[in-house]
Amino acid sequence: MAAASPSVFLLMVNGQVESAQFPEYDDLYCKYCFVYGQDWAPTAGLEEGISQIASKSQDVRQALVWNFPIDVTFKSTNPYGWPQIVLSVYGPDVFGNDVVRGYGAVHVPFSPGRHKRTIPMFVPESTSTLQKFTSWFMGRRPEYTDPKVVAQGEGREVTRVRSQGFVTLLFNVVTKDMKKLGYDTGPVDTQGVLSPSLPQGNPQ
């Protein structure tokens, strides 16, 4: 008797929020969460997390190193709404209040294998000089009530933002049953081994 064809595919993601570059700031920590479409559902692992506080390295890079692990598995019936990871970085201001130092988002890589991504971060800005001074004095900087809005397009065009810092992520991606459902994610099979019959590109 033939085995039934799969009705869903799996996307397994692990890796780490590796490090960050914020030249103007120190003693920062990072929160992450995943945003995905309505046809997706997590089946294992953690959808969100918060790292330890990291201080800048003493070498010339002055990197903030978290090496904070990511491990989650999703199932879906179609690729629409492919998961994105949203990052929020926080740290103290001159008054000791935790304020946002950067938001950023990136899609989980589509092809299986090992991937490295550097995400440019940004912060919302007050629209006037008076608002900037008031928010600085009160210790309440502009921030999103829900960081997941970073991964969505609605309303982003009317938000004033300023670029600030970078965060580096490492992903190890494995997919299962995507080809059986008719989706081709590239020359890497479900075990993460390059297929010898296809040309091998440079690793991302």
Swiss-Prot record:
The protein's superkingdom reads Eukaryota
Gene Ontology cellular-component annotations: centrosome; ciliary basal body; ciliary transition zone; cytoplasm; membrane; MKS complex
In terms of InterPro entries, this protein maps to: C2_B9-type_dom
Q: Which residues form a coiled coil?
A: none
Please state where this protein is localized.
Cytoplasm, Cytoskeleton, Cilium basal body
Domain C2 B9-type positions: 9-127
Task: Give GO MF terms, alphabetically.
Answer: hedgehog receptor activity
Q: Please list the GO biological process terms of this entry.
A: camera-type eye development; cilium assembly; embryonic digit morphogenesis; in utero embryonic development; neuroepithelial cell differentiation; regulation of protein localization; smoothened signaling pathway; vasculature development
Q: Which keywords are on file for this protein?
A: Cell projection, Cilium biogenesis/degradation, Cytoplasm, Cytoskeleton
Pfam annotation, one family: B9-C2
State the family it belongs to. Answer: Belongs to the B9D family.
What the protein does? Component of the tectonic-like complex, a complex localized at the transition zone of primary cilia and acting as a barrier that prevents diffusion of transmembrane proteins between the cilia and plasma membranes. Required for ciliogenesis and sonic hedgehog/SHH signaling.
Can you state the subunit structure given in the record? Part of the tectonic-like complex (also named B9 complex).
**Listed name of the protein:** B9 domain-containing protein 1
